């Protein structure tokens, strides 16, 4: 999601250099990138990083440094595809490739998104339980219905503006990591010298980290939000939306990088904080949100559960509409149905029905006996298996001159994109082969 930068005019309120004016200007510029980055740190991400830090201490810190350029490159490719073609990924596949490829890609997305949405809904319920003594099972249905109603009769922008500030509470992991006083030599070594073990548990954590940082749902969402931005500026036909200037592409790259950097900073400090607290204390098996909250105790003490609860609610409410929305975009584009969050429900009824069905199917996943943290972690592992085939398609599309014209990938983008693809394939295959060892 991006905003087209404009030159400030003499009367532009952004020139107001009061604290409020500067804050408002920063908010407008980084807003879209921040929402994308914060939604990548959804409850499944938080759960995965918590398991990583609690299980292996600082051993996976290097993944934050390693995945940042990869995820930034992939997300910019998706943004560029939406900007140049004026369509989402499913629309591009429908127009330029065989139906079997399109259907396979959309099926992979639906499986990943529905399970991920279900796990995130469960995490929101568990987070509310941290704040009030209400059974999470009693909260699942009301939360799901609320999310559907807000998406259909409200707007995602309303959700994003309301809940991205709650997601900011995740910044507390940064403070907690410092207050826990980790060994600086160990931290630096784990950050810059990769540790790798051919063991099922370690490999599952690596696959999960890749799956939750380079996530299938963000591929489709990023491209579609570029299209939504164009429509919001009055470019309602495909011909009007096609193409982008160098300045627009440069700004989109900056916006994506800001969001992904924020996401990975939070990822790094969640692993660091949990490694310095839970792993050090010997609590390597995390089952509940209350267990995960202990990583924040060095900073806020008894308020740890409250702070984590707020963060999980904020990140979950950001992520679930993106998960269900990207599924709805993909299916609607596949069949040529009217779609878009700017459309009224009566005009794009099938699009909104898809959102509702995706949310409700995710809701029913929660009525199993799997605990919240386990569900979040294995959702990320699943994403780690489903993302690589979609990455192959993104790389093929972004190097197709018929589609991208003069904006095909450069050498660095191709190196980063194919590196992400190969590494994720390799990690998933290694996990399969070592599983029974």
Predicted regions mapped to residue ranges:
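Flexible loop linkers connecting adjacent transmembrane helices
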Residues: 8-14, 48-51, 76-101, 126-128, ...
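Juxtamembrane transmembrane-helix boundary signature
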Residues: 35-36, 63-96, 104-115
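Extracellular/periplasmic helix-exit of transmembrane alpha-helices
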Residues: 70-84, 224-232, 261-291
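Hydrophobic transmembrane alpha-helices that form the core helical bundles
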Residues: 80, 84-85, 102-133, 140-144, ...
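Loop-to-transmembrane helix boundary motifs in multi-pass membrane proteins
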Residues: 99-100, 137-140, 303, 307, ...
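Transmembrane alpha-helical segments of multi-pass small-molecule transport proteins
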Residues: 106-107, 131-153, 169-178, 349-362, ...
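Membrane-interface loop-to-helix entry segments
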Residues: 142, 151-181, 382, 387, ...
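Hydrophobic alpha-helical segments and their helix-loop junctions in multi-pass secondary transporters
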Residues: 168-199, 203, 209-228, 393-402, ...
């Amino acid at each position: 999601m991006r905003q087209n930068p404009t030159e400030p005019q003499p009367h532009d309120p952004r020139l107001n250099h009061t604290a409020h004016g500067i804050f408002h200007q920063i908010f407008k510029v980084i807003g879209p990138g921040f929402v994308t980055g914060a939604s990548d740190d959804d409850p499944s991400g938080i759960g995965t990083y918590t398991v990583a830090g609690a299980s292996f201490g600082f051993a996976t810190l290097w993944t934050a440094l390693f995945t940042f350029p990869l995820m930034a490159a992939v997300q910019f490719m998706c943004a560029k595809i939406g900007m140049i073609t004026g369509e989402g990924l499913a629309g591009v596949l429908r127009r330029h490739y065989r139906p079997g490829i399109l259907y396979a890609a959309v099926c992979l997305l639906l499986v990943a998104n529905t399970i991920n949405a279900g796990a995130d809904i469960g995490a929101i319920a568990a987070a509310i339980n941290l704040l009030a003594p209400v059974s999470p099972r009693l909260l699942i249905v009301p939360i799901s219905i609320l999310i559907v109603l807000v998406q259909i009769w409200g707007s995602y922008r309303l959700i994003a503006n309301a809940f991205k500030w709650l997601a900011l509470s995740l910044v507390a992991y940064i403070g907690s990591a410092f207050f826990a006083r980790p060994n600086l030599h160990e931290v630096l070594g784990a950050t810059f010298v990769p540790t790798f073990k051919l063991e099922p548990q370690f490999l599952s954590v690596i696959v999960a980290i890749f799956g939750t940082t380079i996530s299938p749902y963000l591929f489709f969402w990023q491209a579609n939000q570029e299209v939504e931005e164009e429509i919001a500026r009055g470019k309602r036909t495909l011909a009007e939306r096609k193409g982008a200037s160098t300045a627009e592409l440069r700004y989109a790259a900056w916006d994506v990088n800001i969001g992904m950097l924020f996401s990975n900073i939070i990822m790094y400090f969640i692993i660091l904080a949990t490694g310095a607290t839970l792993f050090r204390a010997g609590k390597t098996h995390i089952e509940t949100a209350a267990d995960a909250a202990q990583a924040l105790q060095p900073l806020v003490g008894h308020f740890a559960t409250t702070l984590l609860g707020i963060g999980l609610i904020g990140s979950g409410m950001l992520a679930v509409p993106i998960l269900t929305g990207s599924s709805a975009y993909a299916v609607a584009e596949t069949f040529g149905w009217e779609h878009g969050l700017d459309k009224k429900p009566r005009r794009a009824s099938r699009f909104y029905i898809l959102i509702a069905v995706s949310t409700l199917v995710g809701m029913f996943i929660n009525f199993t006996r799997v605990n919240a943290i386990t569900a979040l972690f294995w959702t990320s592992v699943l994403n780690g298996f489903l993302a690589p085939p979609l990455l192959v398609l993104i790389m093929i599309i972004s190097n197709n001159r018929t589609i991208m014209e003069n904006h095909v990938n450069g050498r660095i983008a191709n190196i980063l994109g194919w590196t992400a693809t190969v590494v994720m394939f390799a990690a998933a295959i290694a996990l399969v082969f070592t599983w029974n060892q």
